[in-house]
A protein has these predicted regions:
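N-terminal cap/lid segment of alpha/beta-hydrolase-fold proteins
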Residues: 1-29
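Primarily recognizes the serine-hydrolase "nucleophile elbow" in alpha/beta-hydrolase
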Residues: 95-146
Length: 146
């Protein structure tokens, strides 16, 4: 798996992530893509990177990132749980999904979401709002916090 660091912005905050490419990827190709999402803690190097390893081996381009408030993305706050909500994570994932779609390696017509735990609930919320999401998978998830 090849990795390329990316930076984008979500609601004014700098977000840091990675594009994960299959080993056999050739420049100029457009591949289906999956935005891989972590649970509540929003850490890219954990579940998103693990999911990307499995999916890139099957030919997908993947992207993972650290949610707003989790290093190395911006707006880290000492009382993070108070300021990080399902809605802020939905905003971040929606913005990341749009960013992923415009990457040169990505077939923007074949993009989906994958989420673990709270990340799964976030993916369900994003997919319900964005018709560009063509597929969704959740693991160990719930639909809402009520």
């Amino acid at each position: 798996m090849k990795t390329r660091e990316v930076v984008f912005y979500s609601e004014g905050a700098k977000m840091v992530g990675d594009i994960y490419l299959p080993d056999d990827y050739k420049e100029g190709e457009k591949r289906p893509a999956v935005l891989c999402n972590s649970g509540w803690t929003g850490v890219n190097k954990c579940y998103p990177a693990l999911f990307a390893r499995a999916l890139t081996a099957r030919g997908f381009v993947c992207m993972g990132f650290d949610y707003r408030g989790f290093k190395p993305s911006e707006n880290v706050h000492p009382c993070l749980p108070k300021y990080t909500t399902l809605e802020t994570e939905v905003e971040d994932v929606a913005n990341a999904f749009t960013f992923m779609q415009i990457q040169p390696e990505v077939d923007s017509e074949r993009c989906g979401l994958l989420g673990w735990g709270v990340g799964g609930a976030v993916c369900v919320n994003v997919a319900a709002r964005d018709k560009e999401v063509k597929a969704i998978a959740t693991l160990n998830s719930f639909v809402n916090g009520e």
